Amino acid sequence: GYGGIWGGEGATFHHNLLAHHKSRTPRLCGSRYTGRPNDEIVDLRNNVFYNWGPTNGGYAGEGGNYNFINNYYKPGPSTATKDNITYRIFSPNADDGTQTNAPGVWGVFYVSGNYFDDSCSKLSSKSKTNIAKTNADNWVGIHPNTNNGALPEGNIENIKSPVEFKTASTTTHTAIAAYEKVLDYVGASLKRDVIDARVISDVRNGNYTFEGSNGSSNGLIDSQ
C-alpha cells in the first residue's frame, strides 16, 4: 500500500504515524498543479515513519518550500531489504513540465532534528553506518533524483534553506520524544481498536504481523 500525497499552501502535517507502506511516505505534491512554487509551503514535523519501502520512501516535491523537522524514522524489515532507502529522509526531484510548472522546477528544503532508529535486526552494517551519518548530518538523508532535470547549477546547496519556513505555530518535540507521544496518542487513542493496537505494537516491537495476500512480505499489504 501507499502512504499518502501531502501538500498545500501553508499546511502542517505533525504527529502522524505512517507504517507498512511500500512508497509515498509521503509523496509531496509540489506546485505541479498550481504553478505557484512560492505559495506551496508545507511543514512536516514530529511524524513517525515505520517500515517503508522497498519501492520508495518520501519523494518528489516538484516546486515548493518544505520543512522536515524532528521526525522519527524507524526502518523495518521491508525497509532493510534496500540499503539506499534505510537512511533516506526524502528524495526530491525536478518537475518534468507536463503540468503547470516549467520543467526543471525544484523544491527548497529546510531539514533539521530528524532521527533514524537503527534497532531493526535486518539492517546491514552499511545501512547502520549511513544511519549514523544521517543522524549527525540530516542532509546525508536527502537524495535528489535528477532523472527529470539537474539540480540548480548542479549543486545541492541550491535546494537548501538556511532557515525554516514560517507556518502556523505547532507544539514541537524532539524526534525521540515525538516517537513516544505519537505511539501513545495517535489514532483513536481513547479506546484502541484492534487495528490501531496491532500497528502500534508492530512499530514498538520493530516487527510485523501479517504477510500480503498476493506475495508481498515483511508486513506490506497487497489487497483491499
Language model features with spans:
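Glycine-rich beta-solenoid repeat tracts in large extracellular/virion proteins
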Residues: 2-7, 24-36, 55-62, 79-103, ...
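Right-handed parallel beta-helix
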Residues: 1-28, 32-33, 38-53, 65-77, ...
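Long, contiguous C-terminal flanking segments immediately downstream of a protein's structured core
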Residues: 73-224
